[in-house]
């Protein structure tokens, strides 16, 4: 069996042409037949809350723009969505993060996972609700942010899948799984259920977060952009580069 490939690019800043070149190289790992066959792509950023890009809490819009342009050049219908946390409304989050401007510029279909319907799946007796949008697109691009996390130590690609869970349900899962181990087990179950729906994952680590992440830490310039079709390999590699050992990350 071939080992999964993790791509790493050293990128100093949010320069669109440079990131476009990296993204195009990353997507060479997607089978050309799949890109040709699928007409609709879902791009799922990290939209944790209403934070401006310089706060380094959410995926930088320039990284997302590079991905959007790649698929628009191939005449794909692009869906763009997430289920933000916190008390701010979806529109406020989308506007503050710089995502609304992208959606308007490129005429994207914006999906609020909290209101657009969900499916209830089951993993070994554990019911988990996820957005229906995940099952309505042939290509799904998962775009996380490179950060520390107070509960899970590290957040990258796998933790970003939690955004497929509708907003109020996310709050309920935090109540049901309040400690590190139970929450990590829930994340692993979520990955087991939907991981095969994710075509490719990218982690925006050009500027990430250190300290008390995922939202209260300090922006830190790492100058890295990661990509892989394998979420476990991607997170393992990115976490090790950040300085974590395997035992430090509970999932």
Question: What positions do the PLM features span?
Answer:
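N-terminal and secondary-structure boundary signal
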Residues: 1-251
């Amino acid at each position: 069996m071939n080992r999964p490939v993790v791509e790493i690019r050293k990128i100093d800043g949010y320069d669109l042409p440079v990131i476009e070149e990296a993204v195009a190289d990353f997507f060479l790992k997607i089978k050309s037949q799949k890109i040709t066959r699928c007409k609709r792509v879902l791009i799922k950023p990290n939209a944790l809350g209403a934070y401006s890009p310089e706060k380094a809490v959410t995926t930088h819009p320039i990284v997302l723009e590079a991905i959007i342009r790649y698929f628009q050049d191939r005449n794909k219908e692009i869906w763009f969505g997430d289920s933000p946390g916190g008390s701010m409304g979806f529109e406020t989050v989308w506007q503050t993060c710089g995502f609304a401007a992208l959606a308007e510029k490129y005429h994207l279909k914006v999906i609020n996972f909290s209101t657009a319907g969900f499916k209830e799946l089951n993993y070994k007796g554990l019911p988990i609700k996820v957005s229906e949008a995940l099952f309505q697109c042939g290509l799904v691009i998962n775009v996380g942010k490179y950060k520390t996390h107070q509960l899970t130590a590290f957040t990258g690609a796998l933790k970003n899948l939690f955004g497929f869970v509708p907003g109020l349900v996310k709050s309920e899962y935090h109540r049901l799984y309040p400690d590190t181990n139970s929450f990590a087990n829930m994340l692993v179950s979520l990955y087991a259920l939907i991981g095969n729906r994710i075509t490719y994952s990218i982690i925006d680590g050009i500027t990430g977060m250190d300290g008390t992440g995922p939202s209260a830490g300090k922006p830190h310039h790492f100058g890295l952009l990661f990509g892989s079709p394998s979420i476990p390999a991607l997170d393992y590699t990115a976490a090790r580069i950040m300085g974590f050992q395997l035992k430090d990350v509970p999932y």
